[in-house]
Amino acid sequence: MAAAAAWTGAASPNSLLLSRSPPHAAALAPSPGSSMRRRLLLGVGTPAVAALAAAAPPAVLQDGAVTVLITAGAYSLVRVFDELTERRLIEKSLSRKVVHVLSGVLFMSSWPLFSNSTEARYFAAVVPFLNSMRLLIYGLRLYTDEALELLRGPLYYVLVLLFSVLVFWRESPIGIVSLSMMSGGDGFADIVGRRYGSAKLPFNRKKSWAGSISMFISGFLLSAMMMLYFSSLGYIDVIWEEALGKLALVALAATVVECVPVTEVVDDNISVPLATMLVAFLLFSSNRTIVN
């Protein structure tokens, strides 16, 4: 009504100033077609996405959100230590091993964030799967020693993470112990061995007593801590009087395998978790030490 009054002169001067459009307003006004195109460009799919989110089960939304969060966290972890290495605040070898340790530990620690649905493990598997694709694409593009290294140790590492999620998941102590030995045990063996490994093993001059001892201790402790973590959340039941001794046997077996001079043939990121899985399967699945 105010606009009509403005054009007919029935309104006051103030209302005319407020309501009258400039002479060229009609020329500047978007056509119905351009308005439709603008809505399509700015808001395409928004109602559909909202409807899809509303119709999706809560477990799917939870698992999807956690997957995005963990993927972003994994990428950020690598970027932070890459930046520290570029600024020479940390040695490159130490940076890689710290990422080696933290990646496995933090990834396992994130498993309880996923829902209790049967599909939750597949959402969790997306994280190491994407990382393996990244390593493959980056490694195959380059013809350098660094690229070849990426296609060995780091790629094997994330493939073991992927395998453990799909096969064992959080209800199995076998996967938990295997990843603990691979990430914590093998990682600390290299860190300590490089700094204090002057005394070499007589049958493998590339390994040291300090590194092997640290692998046994750190692998055992991390395995026990992760078992306590998952048992406290109700995923596994542990009889600690029996479990601790068997964890020590698993750690010893993994340490022996890591000491064997076959690195050129089988990478530690494959031999250590495979040996751990085998021994853990024999020890933990044959009696009531751990009841799923």
UniProtKB/Swiss-Prot annotation:
Gene Ontology MF terms: phytol kinase activity
Major site of localization recorded for this protein: plastid
Residue stretches spanning the membrane: 98-118, 120-142, 148-168, 216-236, 243-263, 265-285
Protein location: Plastid, Chloroplast membrane
Keyword Iron-sulfur included in the entry's annotation: no
EC numbers, comma separated: 2.7.1.182
Entry membrane topology: Multi-pass membrane protein
Entry coiled-coil feature ranges: none
Keywords: Chloroplast, Kinase, Membrane, Plastid, Transferase, Transit peptide, Transmembrane, Transmembrane helix
Catalytic activity from the UniProt record: phytol + CTP = phytyl phosphate + CDP + H(+)
Any Gene Ontology CC annotation: chloroplast
Matches recorded under InterPro entries: Phytol/farnesol_kinase
Transit peptide feature, positions: 1-49
GO biological process: vitamin E biosynthetic process
Principal EC category: transferase
Involved pathway(s): Cofactor biosynthesis; tocopherol biosynthesis
Function: Involved in the activation and reutilization of phytol from chlorophyll degradation in plant metabolism, including tocopherol biosynthesis. Catalyzes the conversion of phytol to phytol monophosphate (PMP).
Family to which this protein belongs: Belongs to the polyprenol kinase family.
Annotated protein name in UniProt: Probable phytol kinase 2, chloroplastic
Organism: Glycine max (Soybean)
